[in-house]
């Protein structure tokens, strides 16, 4: 059982930390607060400070906890993991909505809230584990490619908008430069695709699962890469399609309370919108070119389902098929009814 809880509030330049010593649900001793730079030197100072204020506890009884803030939190998380310490990186929304009424808002107070969250919710701890090197590289290139696509769209829209306005030397200059930039972006996107293929090809486990995912008509490179990255090659959610669907934001949930609240099931806005949009594109393609998915979609429409509801069912179906095939290490997806376990997904 953990006895020492260290809550860390991450920011770009510093780390605010609060220590709570507890035995069961009883807090022992006074809370300690410290502030450290968010770099390797600061990480060492943080650990030395914790050791100084550890009250005779051992490292196995410590639990570091912080909010998932991306680049601000990943450095310390990896450093502590490498040193053998337990660190829990939790969703910021979960911490905020479990802290009760708060009147004070500053970094010191936030670190105390995080430490208290780790103490009160220690039975729900999910220890931090970094992505392996291949997945980490895949994630960076995938996100970089996504940014490039956004920039290309913005550039094309601006170019099209200017082309429709009055002709002038300035407009000609903008169009000429826009064409050049769009061509360069397209070239870089193609290089990103090659890099993604190269990383997957070099990792046997990624290569195997990637081949399984892309064997499904409608699911291509970007959706397969996205699913591998955000599910940690399906290990993050324990091969549970319902959990993955929740993360994608396609799992429906209803609301019921007493006699006045009875809302039909619908998808939640708590989702990763990037990967949800990619899955939506896959579903659109699958319902056109994948015979089994097309029949499934038409069957739902014939039963009176609205097109968007039927399309969301297709998204869920794709996730369930992918997870089942990966879990069973099927060589490829050829026909839904060829696999009895998939027929009722």
Predicted segment positions?
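Conserved small/polar residues in nucleotide/adenosyl-binding loops
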Residues: 334-341
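Long, charge-rich intrinsically disordered scaffolds of nucleic-acid metabolism proteins
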Residues: 92-211
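Gly/Thr-rich phosphate-binding beta-strand-loop-beta motif of the actin/hexokinase/Hsp70
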Residues: 2-21
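Short, solvent-exposed helix-loop connector elements
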Residues: 126-140, 170, 263-266, 295-312
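Phosphate-backbone recognition surface of nucleic-acid-processing proteins
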Residues: 215, 221, 227-303, 307
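Acidic, metal-coordinating catalytic cores used for nucleic-acid/nucleotide bond scission
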Residues: 65-75
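Nucleic-acid-processing active sites and adjacent nucleic-acid-binding tracks
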Residues: 23-63
